[in-house]
Amino acid sequence: IQELGLPERSEQECLTMIGLRLTEAPAKLFPELDLEPDLYALTYRRLFNEYNVEGAVELYPNVVETLTALKDRGLVLTIASSRSNASLNAYIENLGLSHIITYVLGGNDVQEGKPHPEAVNRTLRELGFQPEEAIVVGDTVFDIHMGRNAGTKTCGVTYGNGSGESLADADWLID
């Protein structure tokens, strides 16, 4: 925001954009301005690559153990993210999740971003599942709406970017 000389926004306002594509966030964050979304996205990616170092993102406690237990019980675990494929796959590898996650769909793989159901629908189709056999777990309202729009059950996790209030539309909440 500073790099582009845009009006200051609060941390809370910026956090509400997490989950949206970088090309969609500017119009929501700065509706009064006529911004070039590609310039915003390119600037964000440049700064992200400059400041994002291995170890900058940490998993919450017990995540690997929980996901491993779910996989051991026969659940198929996938990730659909608006994050670029390159950074998403790097995170999965660096965080030691590669052996747990069956299928990964990044923002580059879909035409429509969250909350559109394209990512969920494509994942279900690729893996041969029906919506009623799936649960979308997420920490933003966009994740929950994506799951709802795809006809799946949804589970909001409040220890990420969302609050119980913002995730109230989820079928279940985990604190």
Model-derived features: positions:
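Surface-exposed amphipathic alpha-helices with a cationic face
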Residues: 64-72, 124, 144-149
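Acidic, Mg2+-coordinating phosphoryl-transfer loop and its flanking beta/alpha structural elements
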Residues: 135-173
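Conserved H-loop
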Residues: 7, 98-102, 130
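A short, structured active-site edge motif that brings together acidic residues
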Residues: 17, 42, 98-112
